[in-house]
From Swiss-Prot:
Residues 148-313 are annotated as: Catalytic. One of its GO terms (cellular component) is periplasmic space. The active site is at residues 220, 245. This is Peptidoglycan hydrolase FlgJ. The gene is flgJ.
Length: 313
């Protein structure tokens, strides 16, 4: 019988292991029930991940023919690693149903199915994107990027695409505004105790806000002149909560209707300024510059990835 360790240590797209399993299963079906069940469980997880990917926009920041190929292969490997060991419990249930009269080895003692929420899938995706960007962006261009900008983009790329799909706000605009308002995550608003507020979009705490707030000194413009003023800002428990509130703010307020229906991220940036999101008279231009920088990053990642695809595995 093929050992599980040998089977699961191989790459998810290793046809040799699958052919070996097929041959052995034909010779001794009973002895190979568990490896086959593991493969079925892996296929189930792959289908789950594929369904999640199909629900996302296909024109993301890092989306290209090559990155979609990489993501597909990556998902296959994730599915195989998720089903290693006790896995999700699906394989053991199939083994029990197929061999009801035979006691299971100690290894297969039933366990509660492992919880695997969407946030964990997102975390795997963020790690993959971060590694991809770290390896693919050329060194001379990499030096011009501030701080942990690549990690910042990787962390927000998938949530921004989901938010864009739900709200209509261009995802490049979401990323650009978060980067501009927070200094690529390095100058985000802090609470009084120094902890992060997760307020990536500089949303102020108006009278209808019932959540926690923090007061800081910020720059506002009056008649084109910059002034330092005290202002209260909303505090969130996570970046995802901040993103959700930001999307709600734009979609529920009629004055931002032109933002949610903008044909491009650049048009959305101008619509934000026209709607009075910020007092900075150059807000739209700053956002547009940030959007162009992100699109340039996307192009460089795609081109470099296509030339060095073998080095990324």
């Amino acid at each position: 019988m093929i050992s599980d360790s040998k089977l699961l240590a191989s790459a998810a797209w290793d046809a040799q292991s699958l052919n070996e399993l097929k041959a052995k299963a034909g010779e001794d079906p009973a002895a190979n029930i568990r490896p086959v069940a593991r493969q079925v469980e892996g296929m189930f997880v792959q289908m789950m991940l594929k369904s999640m990917r199909d629900a996302l926009p296909k024109d993301g920041l890092f989306s290209s023919e090559h990155t979609r190929l990489y993501t597909s292969m990556y998902d296959q490997q994730i599915a195989q690693q998720m089903t290693a060991g006790k896995g999700l419990g699906l394989a053991e249930m199939m083994v029990k149903q197929m061999t009801p009269e035979q006691p299971l080895p100690e290894e297969s003692t039933p366990a509660a199915p492992m919880k695997f929420p969407l946030e964990t899938v997102v975390r795997y995706q963020n790690q993959a994107l971060s590694q991809l960007v770290q390896k693919a962006v050329p060194r001379n261009y990499d030096d011009s990027l501030p701080g942990d900008s690549k990690a910042f983009l990787a962390q927000l790329s998938l949530p921004a695409q989901l938010a864009s799909q739900q709200s209509g706000v261009p995802h490049h605009l979401i990323l650009a505004q978060a980067a501009l308002e927070s200094g690529w995550g390095q100058r985000q608003i802090r609470r009084e105790n120094g902890e992060p507020s997760y307020n990536l979009f500089g949303v102020k705490a108006s009278g209808n806000w019932k959540g926690p707030v923090t007061e800081i000194t910020t720059t506002e413009y009056e008649n084109g002149e910059a002034k330092k003023v005290k202002a209260k800002f909303r505090v969130y428990s996570s970046y995802l909560e901040a993103l959700s509130d930001y999307v709600g703010l734009l979609t529920r307020n009629p004055r931002y209707a032109a933002v949610t229906t903008a044909a491009s991220a650049e048009q959305g940036a101008q619509a934000l300024q026209d709607a009075g999101y910020a007092t900075d008279p150059h807000y739209a231009r700053k956002l547009t510059n940030m959007i162009q920088q992100m699109k340039s990053i996307s192009d460089k990642v795609s081109k470099t990835y296509s030339m060095n695809i073998d080095n990324l595995f």
